[in-house]
From Swiss-Prot:
This is Translation initiation factor IF-2. Residues 543-545 are annotated as: G5. GTP binds at residues 407-414, 453-457, 507-510. One of its GO terms (molecular function) is translation initiation factor activity. The gene is infB. Residues 162-179 have a biased composition (Low complexity). It comes from Aeromonas salmonicida (strain A449). It is found in: Cytoplasm. GO terms for cellular component: cytosol. NCBIfam families: IF-2, small_GTP. Residues 507-510 are annotated as: G4. Residues 398-567 form the tr-type G domain. Residues 432-436 are annotated as: G2. It comes from the Bacteria.
Length: 898
């Protein structure tokens, strides 16, 4: 694993750097600076040291505690003249509490000493017995061995004597005699060994009996003393309160107060036998807070009890864990402190802070490690229940195809659609290029077709992907005179990814330079094969200008839709997809929805991504009010709680309350995911964070007219970032530029960019007072180019050295003021006094510095041109020789561009 700096580790575990350095020193690890690197083994060493320190260095409570209590009360005594007066009485009590552990430690120590003594005696006795037994066995073995050898020797001598007496014995008789002698010797040896073992055993038993008698005598002598010590310890234990917790103190104090109260009540009853006084005393005894002293203060209650009882054991809980949870929330569910959870995670090898978001699996392991039962909960149960409660009993019927027109920029997509719709849409787009998704439906003789017109510019990749995702057929427009271009290839990839059939419209066929065969050949490289060549893609030659081939294109689209057998449920609750969304100043959030199933009606409750609402009004693409819309129809809906993101699914639900709950849940989940992405406390991106401070940033606040344009601009600007300059989107949104946007731009030193929107009056005041850079755009080309220029201004300039003169040393002479002075001839360019120089010897630079003096005919001059002689003194350098060259150069700053 990569090493981490002390500073980064301190940030990860949320502790000061100085404290972490001190902990390293305490653990025996040499770390003195915040930039020092910490390896994995050093982290484990520190963790082990902290565990040991926290586990062993517990604060020792005092073994004995003395409490003093003062109780103040007033009694009424009879004074002179028959009047009663109040006298204050103060009762002081002193209690001494002894910690249970202290007495128990003494008792355990005494028991341990007694046990050790008895064990030592038993061990000594057993060792003595074993030693005696082993000595006896060894002695018996040696004696038996000696006896065996003697018997064998005796038998051998007898056999030899018998052999001598019988000079010619038989061989068998000799062998038999020898065997008999060996058997006799063996029996004698065994008998001797048995006798010796019996003798040793008797001696060991006598020694053991002697040791036992000594132990009995010692116990009889010390028994009374040991009994007295045990009785003294028991008496001492019974004289003290062994518990020092608050419950025992409260119970004892309550008993003392009852005795004191009863004593005062009896004294008052004797001296004041009036009925009213008795009633007053009874009331006081029933309600101790009712009686007040002279100063009107409440008297202390008799019993100071509270309802909380400290649990005697750990309570095992059922911990409900969602998909993501923070460490603090997990600790709260388990009713423990966050520090305990962090400790448990550190023991398991995971470092986390109290606000860090952890996943469900990690939280489950931590909770089970701490002894709790885990209940895993799916966060989207309510969402699934709401979305599943739908009317889906109707039969599916044929529907109109949804056709997306895609292709490279300026290949004539919108112009082709204009001719079909008999309207001029392209002229209304800024710069003549499409920057929004346009959704239109067209009634033809053969049926209805819904068209989605997507932008062709490179910045609108997400828009094209969104269009391909919600379409049935893709019409790929390729200019016959231009061929396949980058966005054409991208459109093919989107269509292939969405598994949507492609109909190729070869546009601009009326131009003289049109070459449709080249288009077929180029598209074949990307697996778009014509039906003429055995493929499955229809190729139609059209001209958006003259209208040639338009009917053939519509017929090809309808044929393709018949092959696909497109069907959808017409009746029932509608569902669709958001094609585009924007914020209208007078109407509020407006979303363009393409209905895919069911019928969308005015008054329906719609759940749309992170937003919800009841449809207040519906309009078609021409702005006409409509009451309902069926499948494959694009409509604008009003009444949502906010501007949904383009591409979100729009679904009609039954209950507005549940729709609101689901929307709020989605917003919270989106926030959690966003926070989880922003977690920087990871070792993997440590080096990226370290170099982040060296990168210049261009902050931008973007406001656009529709949500799709905001996404496209953000993606395009982020892609401009380089290693030296980074584009940071501080804020973005849909609608006009407000005072909040201007304040955000002022706080972050950002450029305000308005795309087809303008700033209101309050925002203009802030912009003028703060001198902010506000720029309006209607074409995305201009926006990207100007942001590039702003990024170029943030680039560090490049410096280049340019040689302006060269002088050759002809002679060297000494000067008392300058040292070695070179007499030179300027051979190239100009030698200037203010510029830096290099001294070259054999075309190798040996010194780099500056001129101290430049003279011509004993006069100081600022420059000497080519072909003239001069005297040059180099500052702080005297090793100038004949034949050296002095090169004069200047540094030029060159502004870099992206």
């Amino acid at each position: 694993m990569a090493e981490v700096s002390v500073k980064q580790l301190a940030t990860d575990i949320d502790t000061p750097v100085d404290r972490l350095l001190q902990q390293f020193v305490d653990a025996g690890i040499s770390k003195s600076k915040a930039d020092d690197l910490v390896s994995e083994s050093e982290k484990q060493t520190l963790l082990a040291h902290l565990k040991k320190q926290h586990g062993g260095d517990e604060l020792t409570a005092p073994a004995r505690m003395t409490l003093q209590r003062k109780t103040k009360s007033t009694i009424s005594v009879q004074g002179t003249g028959g009047k009663n007066k109040e006298v204050q009485v103060e009762v002081r009590k002193t209690r001494t509490y002894v910690k249970r552990s202290a007495l128990e430690d003494e008792q355990r120590q005494a028991e341990a000493e007694e046990t050790a003594r008895l064990e030592a005696e038993e061990k000594a006795r057993s060792e003595a017995e074993n030693k005696v037994r082993l000595d006896a066995e060894e002695k018996a073995r040696r004696e038996a061995e000696q006896a065996r050898r003697e018997a064998e020797e005796k038998a051998r001598i007898e056999a030899q004597s018998k052999a001598r007496q019988a000079p010619q014995p038989a061989k068998a008789a000799s062998s038999t005699a020898q065997q008999e002698a060996e058997k006799m010797a063996k029996r004698e040896a065994e008998e001797l060994k048995r006798q010796q073992e019996q003798t040793a055993l008797q001696k060991a038993e006598e020694l053991a009996a002697k040791k036992a008698e000594e132990a009995r005598l010692m116990a009889e002598q010390n028994g009374p003393r040991w009994a007295e010590e045990e009785a003294a310890r028991a008496k001492e234990s019974s004289d003290y309160h062994l518990t020092t917790n608050k419950h025992a103190q409260a119970a004892e104090d309550e008993l003392d107060r009852k005795e004191e109260t009863s004593r005062r009540t009896a004294a008052a009853a004797v001296k004041a036998p009036k009925k009213a006084g008795r009633r007053e005393d009874d009331r006081d005894s029933r309600n101790p807070r009712a009686r007040k002293g002279k100063r009107g203060k409440m008297a202390m209650p008799n019993a100071m009890k509270h309802g909380f009882n400290k649990p005697a054991a750990v309570v095992n809980r059922d911990v409900v864990i969602g998909e993501t949870i923070t460490v603090a929330e997990l600790a709260n569910k388990m009713a423990v402190k966050g520090v305990e959870v962090i400790k448990a995670m550190m023991k398991m090898g995971a470092m986390a802070t109290i606000n860090q978001v952890i996943d469900q699996e990690t939280a489950q392991l931590v909770a089970e490690e701490m002894g709790h039962k885990v209940v895993l909960r799916r966060e989207n149960e309510l969402e699934e229940a709401v979305l599943s409660d739908r009317d889906e009993t109707s039969e599916a019927k044929s529907r109109a195809p949804v056709v997306t027109i895609m292709g490279h920029v300026d290949h004539g997509k919108t112009s082709l659609l204009d001719y079909i719709r008999k309207a001029k849409v392209a002229a209304g787009e800024a710069g003549g290029i499409t920057q929004h998704i346009g959704a239109y439906h067209v009634e033809t003789d053969s049926g209805m077709i819904t068209f989605l017109d997507t932008p062709g510019h490179a910045a609108f990749t997400s828009m094209r992907a969104r269009g391909a995702k919600s379409t049935d057929i893709v019409v790929l427009v390729v200019a016959a005179d231009d061929g396949v271009m980058p966005q054409t290839i991208e459109a093919i990839q989107h269509a292939k990814a969405a598994e949507v059939p492609i109909v190729v419209a070869v546009n601009k066929i009326d131009k003289p330079e049109a070459d449709p065969d080249r288009v077929k050949t180029e598209l074949a490289r990307y697996n778009v094969m014509s039906e003429d060549w055995g493929g499955d893609s229809q190729f139609v030659h059209v001209s958006a200008k003259s209208g040639e081939g338009i009917d053939d294109l519509l017929e090809a689209i309808l044929i393709q839709s018949e092959v696909l057998e497109l069907k959808a449920v017409v009746d029932g609750m509608a569902s669709g997809v958001v094609i585009e969304s924007f914020l209208d100043k007078g109407r509020g959030p407006v979303a363009t929805v393409l209905v895919q199933e069911g019928t969308l009606r005015q008054g329906d409750i719609v759940l749309c991504g992170l937003e919800y609402g009841r449809i207040r009004a519906m309009r078609d693409e021409l702005g006409r009010e409509i009451k309902e819309a069926g499948p494959s129809l694009p409509v604008e809906i009003l009444g949502l709680s906010g501007v949904p993101s383009a591409g979100d699914e729009a679904t009609v639900v039954r209950d507005e309350k549940k729709a609101r709950e689901v929307a709020l849940y989605r917003q919270g989940k989106f926030r959690d995911v966003k926070l989880a992405r922003q977690q920087k406390a990871k070792l993997e991106n440590m080096f990226a964070n370290m170099t982040e401070g060296e990168v210049s940033e261009v902050n931008v606040v973007i406001k656009a007219d529709v949500q799709g344009s905001v996404q496209a601009i953000c993606d395009a600007l982020v892609q401009l970032s380089t290693d030296e300059v980074k584009v940071k989107i501080v804020g973005s949104g849909v609608g006009g530029i407000t005072e909040t946007d201007a304040t955000l731009a002022a706080a972050s030193s950002a450029i305000l960019v308005g795309f087809n929107v303008r700033a209101d009056a309050s925002a203009r005041k802030v912009i003028e007072s703060e001198s902010l850079d506000l720029r309006y755009y209607s074409v995305i080309y201009d926006l990207i180019d100007e942001v590039k220029q702003a990024m170029s201004g943030k680039l560090a300039p490049e410096y280049r050295q340019e040689i302006i003169g060269l002088a050759e040393v002809r002679s060297v002479f000494k000067s008392p003021k300058f040292g070695a002075v070179a007499g030179c001839m300027v051979t190239e360019g100009v030698v200037k006094r203010s510029n830096r120089i290099r001294v070259l010897r054999d075309n190798v630079v040996i010194y780099e510095g500056e001129l101290e003096s430049l003279r011509r005919f004993k006069d100081d001059v600022n420059e000497v041109r080519n072909g003239y002689e001069c005297g040059i003194a180099v500052k702080n350098y005297n090793d100038v020789r004949e034949g050296d060259q002095i090169e004069v150069y200047e540094t030029i700053e060159i502004q870099r561009t992206l």
